[in-house]
Amino acid sequence: MMNPFLPEGCDPPPPPQPMEGLHENAPPPFLTKTFEMVDDPNTDHIVSWNRGGTSFVVWDLHSFSTILLPRHFKHSNFSSFIRQLNTYGFRKIEAERWEFANEEFLLGQRQLLKNIKRRNPFTPSSSPSHDACNELRREKQVLMMEIVSLRQQQQTTKSYIKAMEQRIEGTERKQRQMMSFLARAMQSPSFLHQLLKQRDKKIKELEDNESAKRKRGSSSMSELEVLALEMQGHGKQRNMLEEEDHQLVVERELDDGFWEELLSDESLASTS
């Protein structure tokens, strides 16, 4: 039957065709989310592709479980994630680290995800008991790795707490010594006088030591070299620098040694 609305001699247009790929099955959300998670360069320190882009590696198990899994899958169960990988045919290819591979899960080949099919729970070549044993072995391995990671975190936390306790203990000890020092200084004027004598003695010892060191250093230069430095004006500058260094050494020794000795329990007891 001719179409009355078409001009004479014109062929009718071809019927509409379905869009290419319209009826193709989209990859499962688990595979899509896993691909996006592995492909994100911002989290390469946690999970990333291997060098060849044929597998992915979980580098930081703790961060992967506590940060990435909740972000993409709304849970933090690494064992559950491993079970999902197994159902889609992924295999663990490295015994010493969490590295997984699938022939259709490749870097830059997102379109291949649709080829990954979910495996049937039972196949004719395997018995239910055999599959259950393999699943239990994989879960045991996952749990053992999680235990190792938790123990490492626990050890790190213990070391940090111990260091903080030592710092607090040292601060409290210095506070007690300072309070004892101030109390005795207020009660006995002779106490302060004796401490000042100790300080002067300490300064004199340091000055004598520094003078001896300078003399030994100067003796290594000939009189002609010293005279040449004096004529060029470097001798005075050298002496000024030596005096500044000497003053810094004395102040540092007093800060590091004198007050540490002064605030010690033995020193406070001997001056009382």
UniProtKB/Swiss-Prot annotation:
Residues 27-121 bind DNA. Residues 132-186 are annotated as: Hydrophobic repeat HR-A/B. A motif (Bipartite nuclear localization signal) lies at residues 201-216. The keyword Transcription regulation applies. Its main location: nucleus. It is found in: Nucleus. It comes from the Eukaryota. Residues 203-212 have a biased composition (Basic and acidic residues). GO terms for molecular function: DNA-binding transcription factor activity; transcription cis-regulatory region binding. A motif (AHA) lies at residues 256-265. Keywords: Activator, DNA-binding, Nucleus, Phosphoprotein, Stress response, Transcription, Transcription regulation. One of its GO terms (cellular component) is nucleus. GO terms for biological process: response to heat. Residues 1-26, 203-223 are annotated as: Disordered. Homotrimer. The hydrophobic-rich region (HR-A/B) corresponds to the oligomerization domain. AHA motif is a transcriptional activator element. Transcriptional activator that specifically binds DNA sequence 5'-AGAAnnTTCT-3' known as heat shock promoter elements (HSE). Belongs to the HSF family. Class A subfamily. This is Heat stress transcription factor A-7a. It comes from Arabidopsis thaliana (Mouse-ear cress). The gene is HSFA7A.
